[in-house]
Amino acid sequence: MSTGAPRRLGVRHHKLRAPRKHGLSVSVEEMWSRLSAAIAQIQHHNISKLSYEEHYRYAYNLILNQQGDMLYQGVQLQIQEHLVNQSDMRLTPVFSLSIEEAQAASQAMSGSDKGKLRDNTARLLGLLPGNAEALFPTIPAGERFLSAVTAMWDDHCSCMSKIRDVLKYVDRVYVPNHRREPIWDLGLDLFRDTVVRSTRVPCRTNLLVAMLRQVYCEREGATVERRTIKAVTDMLLSLLHDAKQSVYTHDFEPIFLSTTSEYYATEATRLLESQRATYYLQSAERRFAEEQARVDACLSPNTLAPLKEIVERRLLTEHLDEILAMPDGGLVVLLDTDARADMERMYRLFRLVPTGLDALNKVLRAYVTDRGKIINETTLCESKNTQTPSAEMAMSWVNQVLNTKSRLDGVLATSFQGDKSCEAAINEAMDTFINLNTRAPEFISLYIDEHLRKGTRFADDTTALEPVLDKTITIFRYVHEKDVFERYYKMHLTRRLLHNRSASDDAERSMIAKLKVECGHGYVQKLQGMLNDMKLSEEVLRAFHHTLEREGTSLPLQLNVNVLTATYWPIASPKEPSIFPPALTEACNAFEKFYDTRHRGRVLTWQPSLGTADVRVQFKSRTHELVVSTYALMVL
């Protein structure tokens, strides 16, 4: 018979023939006497010579002769007396508590009805961490008592199954007509009231304390017999307190959860004293697994949810900020040392509790902001040193920001499992410190300029250029003043294009395409126009030289002209006209005449401030080639 026998448990029934219809051959008193003797034989496991048909007929005839009350009450009293005798013989001798201990334990657990529990029950019962040496010796006695209870329970269930078969007619006719409990349910209630909740002996107190001590000792590292605990659990689940609750949920579970809460409150205090977050979380993780395994092995599955909430609240929820701020293994330390496995454990555990990720993200956000401010302050100190070029500062600042972003992205992906709330915290902090640097738009533009300028080590490596531009865009997204960035970018692009320093047209267009994705067509319209002007200028210049060759005209110098659309370029009109040297004037006039034939009505305005000239100068025996501005050419 299973120890966790539920009510109305399906059992194998003996085949019974219908009783023969005949008059009473024996008196009512004799029938009851024989039936009572048969029940006694069943209770003593001496059934080899019993006739189920005969005794079924006795019960049948007693019901027909209106003796159902006498029969039902007699069976109830006989079962009760048997349970009292069995309890005195089998349980009382193996009580694990003395009379004084039982009285003290009962007082400690008083008030447990309806969930109203003392907040110091575990302390009164000696069930707090550190008391293992005192309770480990009680394990064998507790095991003997619990085993005796389950053995008596198994014996009772076996007897009740056979008694129910004999009294099947009682269940079929008498019970529903008189609103009595079925024989099986009667037996369970009698076991509950006569044994488990006996008012004669402190069986309930011994049972609860033994169960609690076994669990406590296992928590402290001892090995206990889980099968026995499981058997007691099944028994208590089979016994009903009322229509909604079992004895397990009414008597055992509240006191178990209450003492568990006290235990882990004390355990958390002990672990916090170590000031080692990694050790704390490893211990918490181990405790969670132990409690899960214990429920799976020997407690009710319904206990898991409230138990889990208690352990998580005591070990995590109530100490989130303390764990995060620990000097050894706190989140800041883990981030600084890039301890991703430990951060993954922290994230995984903090995610279990409602406010865990909020607390973690608060520290994460502050960490990223603080590290970003350090980057900004370092750059600010460099900017005060006039010997540090802006481009060098920009490269340093953007590289540090990119390195920080890359490291945090790695932490987000591996340790925080791509959690959206963690990602939002990182992005918010990045946004904050990047925009605290008022030169961020300029630095990002300079960084891009350094990679797109011809002759730099970055522009020469075309395979590595695209990933760099992609990473730069991730920083650009955080910039609030994108109009400021556009102004700097146009200025740097102008220099690259007009001074023939752009690495390639494809690279320029790729970068502008990325900006278009981020900010839309209107944002890059003028930038695209600048590139188109340069392409059209090449075509116009080729046509100009071809015309000169065809006409056999030669110029006093080689002239290269870029025709720019004024609205696209960051160019101011010259305030005063410039006086070019005669040779330059002749070349300019020739170009204007040619351009007018192709674009009649358009007016060209020369911008000497943007031009350069290659000049060969003879100094005695040495010749020098100079690259000078147009204004310098005019002076020379």
Residue ranges of each PLM-predicted region?
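Eukaryotic scaffold/interaction segments
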Residues: 1-636
